Amino acid sequence: MDILKYTTETRLYIKNNKDIVDYFDEVINQYSYIFRKVYYIIRNDPKLKINLLNTELQNEYSISKRTANSIIKTVQGIINSIRELKKTEIKQKQYKLEKISKKLEKLIPKLLDLKLKAKENNIEDLIKYRNLKTKIAFMKIRKDKLINKINSLNYQIETNKFKITFGTKKLFRQNLEKFLNKRDNQIVFIGSKEETACNQTFQLRYISKINQFIIKMRKDFKYKNEKGEERYAYGKCFFNNHSKLLREILKSKNSPLTYRIIKRNNEYYLQCIFEIDNKNTILTRKDYG
């Protein structure tokens, strides 16, 4: 089955989503800390039993099983994506290495011929010899760099220790606040088709009278054991793209709905990620844009 992933995004206006925005700002630093910690735990021990890690996160940070699961799955997805990117990068480097090696195989014999001719002190041959010698020297340097890079990439894949940073050192040195906002800028809620509204912790309900999606978000951390409405944050939004398709998924429950709240330049956005079967692609393009 060929599955296509779609992502649609809308802005969360504070006037309609104050509870959600306030909760995001309240917990984002703690959430991001857990996220980074989980990344390094899984990176250093990829064979770790995930159910034990999930339980540990619940107990240590007062988060639900679903929130812990969302963090773990997101981290696993990032690591898998990085691994595939590294494999692609290796193929690209190997292609370049092969091209340089073939060129060197052709040029080195020519260099030896020119070296013999240059001994006769022919100025033209001497210039050609020096130019080709310089060219080959630079090509050998490039070849060595490619070999070292390929070895480094293979080592990263074998050890699971990828070179990744959460934010840049340059931004950290220039502006600490901007660095933190860039690094700690999103919360993910991974869904499942089997759950209510295809997501247990973040749910949408479409209200046709106002043409809006009502948001119900389950809160964690110090709110984990709260009862009733104190456990939730509410808001509303509308998606300009794929709105009809999203409403259909909420009815049919034929795709998990994963949500991502992102803070970007002091504005808040909601992304919804869902899947459709490729056999319905033509129908989707026609009916939903």
Tell me what each language-model feature is.
Residues 1-289:
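Nucleic-acid substrate recognition interfaces
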